[in-house]
Regions:
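Short alpha-helical scaffolding segments that buttress acidic/His motifs in well-ordered protein cores
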Residues: 28-31, 43-47, 95, 99
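Hydrophobic/aromatic-rich alpha-helical bundle segments in the mid-to-C-terminal region
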Residues: 57, 61, 78-130
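Amphipathic alpha-helical segments used for helix-helix packing
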Residues: 36-58
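Short amphipathic alpha-helical interaction/hinge segments
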Residues: 8-13, 39, 71-75, 103-110
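The cytosolic transmitter module of two-component sensor histidine kinases
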Residues: 24-25, 88
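Alpha-helical structural segments
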Residues: 1-22, 29-34, 62-73, 117-124
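Secondary-structure edge/capping motif, primarily at the C-terminal ends of alpha-helices
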Residues: 19, 50, 106-110
Length: 131
């Protein structure tokens, strides 16, 4: 469990080693890619196991909370988002929720063409919302 959580965090930090990216489309695409890749699938298997195992649930929940906070923080940095502005925090969280949803949709079918259209739309929405 710890390995999967650490690998997801490492992959996230490695997205843009120089920090904030000027291209929000690239940031959105990279975040979505994290949720459509093998590390997300591995995490999902842990989630399913934890949903039925009372002893496992607290540990997986703790790890996911940590990875979730780090993902949010890194997304804010990469998007140059100012969370002191009302609605910005929720916008970033919505982006991450959308990315997770696309990851779930990708489990059974490859919807890369639709996913690219959604990524493009979200990048435009973020440009408007974040300035």
């Amino acid at each position: 469990m710890e390995y999967v959580a650490e690998e997801r965090s490492t992959a996230l930090r490695a997205l843009f080693p120089e920090g904030a990216a000027g291209d929000r489309h690239a940031v959105v695409a990279a975040l979505v890619d994290l949720y459509t890749g093998p590390l997300f699938r591995a995490a999902l298997h842990l989630w399913v196991a934890a949903s039925n195992e009372d002893q496992l649930r607290p540990r997986v929940t703790e790890l996911e909370s940590r990875v979730g906070r780090e993902t949010h923080r890194i997304a804010v940095d990469l998007l140059s988002a100012d969370e002191s502005v009302p609605g910005v925090r929720e916008t970033v969280q919505g982006l991450l929720d959308m990315a997770r949803g696309l990851g779930l949709a990708n489990l059974l079918t490859d919807d890369a063409a639709r996913r690219e259209r959604v990524v493009t739309q979200w990048a435009e929405l973020l440009d408007e919302a974040l300035g």
